[in-house]
């Protein structure tokens, strides 16, 4: 049912938008018809369809990242941003937009615009991921590693604030727009790269269900069964870091999906069996992201709402409910 819901929402995102296109024409374009309006064809194939697929993949990616991090750190509030990966990505973008004037030059190689932002976001996120990956070999305690991640995030945020203070008004505005998040940055020509890396990482995460099922019983129990918990933690850090870097670089920092969706999946399935919980989390994350994306384009005449204005409306009540349920 969840899979059918995801497909239905994907089609809804393709059929509906700021420009009113007849349903028959949309369907004809999707089926390869050539007798439709050229501008409508461009809107569907170059904008709406890539945006819907991006929302589908990003929702699943960030949600499964949150689920795996919550399992590894045994912390229900762990999510991709808690390790400082999103902040590292934001720092990379801030350096390009606010310090380097929107472009990067390395020797004879120079590039600007979206390419510079994409490269900076990805490099920033992966540098933090590599830092956490390196520290995970030194720090044995998951709690201490979590604290280091939080402090890394605070440090990155502090540098970003300083850059904002000294930057131009145009630079600050550009950075704020990127920070609001959106799924429209992945155009049709960028989608294959985004989709390929996302799908490979999602398949890798599905392959981790058995060790995750053992890990949830406790690290000592997992070690007794022959699970190398440190190696498992490193693999999860690498996969979540890569997914977070990818989605943040292309879409900006998307809030609450990685934190809230795993709990929504647990509430619906009422199980901690990762064989069903992990695939369900990916599907529910995709559904929530598509719903949020659809909500963003509803006020078509007034423009598109930033995705981060909608995701907390979904995520915050879930977290509040979980916290209250544990204390009542």
What is the role of each PLM region?
Residues 1-328:
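Alpha-helical transmembrane segments in inner-membrane proteins
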